[in-house]
Curated annotation (Swiss-Prot):
Keywords: Repressor, Ribonucleoprotein, Ribosomal protein, RNA-binding, rRNA-binding, Translation regulation, tRNA-binding. NCBIfam families: rplA_bact. The gene is rplA. This is Large ribosomal subunit protein uL1. The lineage of its organism: Bacteria, Pseudomonadati, Campylobacterota, Epsilonproteobacteria, Campylobacterales. It comes from Campylobacter curvus (strain 525.92). Binds directly to 23S rRNA. The L1 stalk is quite mobile in the ribosome, and is involved in E site tRNA release. Protein L1 is also a translational repressor protein, it controls the translation of the L11 operon by binding to its mRNA.
Amino acid sequence: MGKTTKRFQELLKKVEENKIYNLDEAITTIKTLASAKFDETVEIALKLNVDPRHADQMVRGSVVLPAGTGKTVRVAVIAKDAKADEAKAAGADIVGSDELVEDIQKGIMNFDVLIATPNLMGLVGKVGRILGPKGLMPNPKTGTVTMDVAQAVNNAKSGQVNFRVDKQGNIHAGLGKVSFSKEQLNENISTFIKAINKHKPSASKGRYVKNASLSLTMSPSIALDTQEVMDLK
């Protein structure tokens, strides 16, 4: 623990206290904070001026990051017949229907993303209580309930990130690896922020983004200029 604390203190020296960073500065600085023995994830944290207890202030959706997430994503698809064939052809790792649901009921879930065709959502509903808490329940808002299973598989494989505001109005997401180039990180972060701004509820009044910051898996956070964040459209 002492070793970790000492390392963290050293990293803190690289971040100017009370400074608000523009995006370019933040990305340049964040890359100097890599200190772990693995390729750390670049994470964004946003505090939005919304009250998600009200349905008209929920912020939820998905976006495909141009440079991907840097992760290998295992995709499962609940589909039958021609749609099952399409999913397999698109590169889905697991494809099935009743037997796949039975596996989920047994706790066998060797996937990171689950996609389903609308006509089989009744079947998926049988395991909703298992999938829901794990964030794996297919949902039309994230493009995981669809007849276009091939596109959904491609999106998931190529870096789709789902986002949903929590009860306190926060959104967290991993937007790539610290080994990515500055250009790749800038593109990913900008694309994600634009998606958040696009989903601004009409019921949200005043400053939409109250706080924004970047960090690595094991680093201090860097405060972002919220006006610059809100100006990304």
